[in-house]
Amino acid sequence: MWPGNAWRAALFWVPRGRRAQSALAQLRGILEGELEGIRGAGTWKSERVITSRQGPHIRVDGVSGGILNFCANNYLGLSSHPEVIQAGLQALEEFGAGLSSVRFICGTQSIHKNLEAKIARFHQREDAILYPSCYDANAGLFEALLTPEDAVLSDELNHASIIDGIRLCKAHKYRYRHLDMADLEAKLQEAQKHRLRLVATDGAFSMDGDIAPLQEICCLASRYGALVFMDECHATGFLGPTGRGTDELLGVMDQVTIINSTLGKALGGASGGYTTGPGPLVSLLRQRARPYLFSNSLPPAVVGCASKALDLLMGSNTIVQSMAAKTQRFRSKMEAAGFTISGASHPICPVMLGDARLASRMADDMLKRGIFVIGFSYPVVPKGKARIRVQISAVHSEEDIDRCVEAFVEVGRLHGALP
């Protein structure tokens, strides 16, 4: 007779490889169920393959003919600018493909320091620090800066990277209603017991195209002794008279404490993000921000492209000035046709449709007519608020914009979105 429970172990013994296969089969079943649920809800996100450079005119795999691109963050059209490309090639030749290191070991080159200094000058701040992306900048900031003694007050529609970054910190968390200054004031009053109070907001909200009321936010922050943080990914390079962003547009550059933004949209479109603000804060981030400490340095070619993009922007504001008229042309024509366009005076122009399947099907039919746009639905936007987000670029022509509107009208009528 076998001792103890050995006989039970023998009875239920399964070879290790078979147990692993069983676990994998279980995982596959769970994942397939999740994926089928996404498809069934009409929120499946497919990835179109572009076979050309980024720009207003592109080629898409499986689609014949040229395509007009109205869904890129390439606001200034600099991603394919010849001087930007040449600067990237020059940096690649001079500094190599990459650093194979994090910044504090052997991953800092002169071009990294030069770009950080240039970013600080551009935003009129004391210092700046580069990250692989603005998602990383947001992930690194709050945890390094805020302690359990502090509080962060966040707009409910802030970008996912801000929300995720705030989740990582140990500060007390308050969420105020979108753009609701009365609610923000109530939350600031409630947060008076904490050491530091940081108001966190997008400058321009990426899904709605609306702009934070920075003057009111800064006024409340001053009244209640709070700091102001702003994510400028959808503003840097093209909002404000010289493209400095939302704080320049609204005349509060000296009142916003911290700015996070990206090199991956208007400033060349490659990748990279940054924080700019007080010198001691940037120094602390170099010591404490985990995405900075544990991620490889930005590749030299990316740094070279972004640096040249900033040079072009600081040298002339002609490109910036062309944005407003083109944005207004699209918005006014679409609204005259009967569409509802969210936001105001921003090149992000969300065509509000409500139904996820409708947004997806209309986007597919737009592509058949040579217009590349994307339908956005839950969880990227709230349920019942699906939309097609159109983004205007400085390099779109008036003819491009008119062609896009004509296609929307045709497809809208086809799907019953217009009478």
Swiss-Prot record:
A Pfam family this chain is assigned to: Aminotran_1_2
Annotated localization: Mitochondrion; Nucleus
Record PTM N6-succinyllysine, positions in chain: 45, 187, 326, 368, 383
Catalyses which reaction(s): glycine + acetyl-CoA = (2S)-2-amino-3-oxobutanoate + CoA
Keyword Mitochondrion applies: yes
Enzyme class, UniProt record, top EC level: transferase
Expression sites by tissue: Strongly expressed in heart, brain, liver and pancreas. Also found in lung.
MF (Gene Ontology): glycine C-acetyltransferase activity; pyridoxal phosphate binding
Name of the protein this chain belongs to: 2-amino-3-ketobutyrate coenzyme A ligase, mitochondrial
Record-listed E.C. numbers: 2.3.1.29
Highest taxon listed in the record's lineage: Eukaryota
Binding, pyridoxal 5'-phosphate: 134-135, 206, 262-265, 295-296
The family this protein is said to belong to: Belongs to the class-II pyridoxal-phosphate-dependent aminotransferase family.
Transmembrane segments: none
N6-acetyllysine PTM sites in chain numbering: 45, 187, 383
Organism: Homo sapiens
Taxon lineage: Eukaryota, Metazoa, Chordata, Craniata, Vertebrata
Gene3D superfamilies xref list: Aspartate Aminotransferase, domain 1, Type I PLP-dependent aspartate aminotransferase-like (Major domain)
Residues engaged in binding substrate: 159, 389
Cofactor: pyridoxal 5'-phosphate
Residue positions, PTM N6-(pyridoxal phosphate)lysine: 265
One term under GO cellular component: mitochondrial inner membrane
Keyword Transport applies: no
Transit peptide as recorded in UniProt: 1-21
Function of the molecule: Pyridoxal phosphate (PLP) dependent enzyme, which catalyzes the cleavage of 2-amino-3-oxobutanoate to glycine and acetyl-CoA.
One BP annotation, GO: amino acid metabolic process
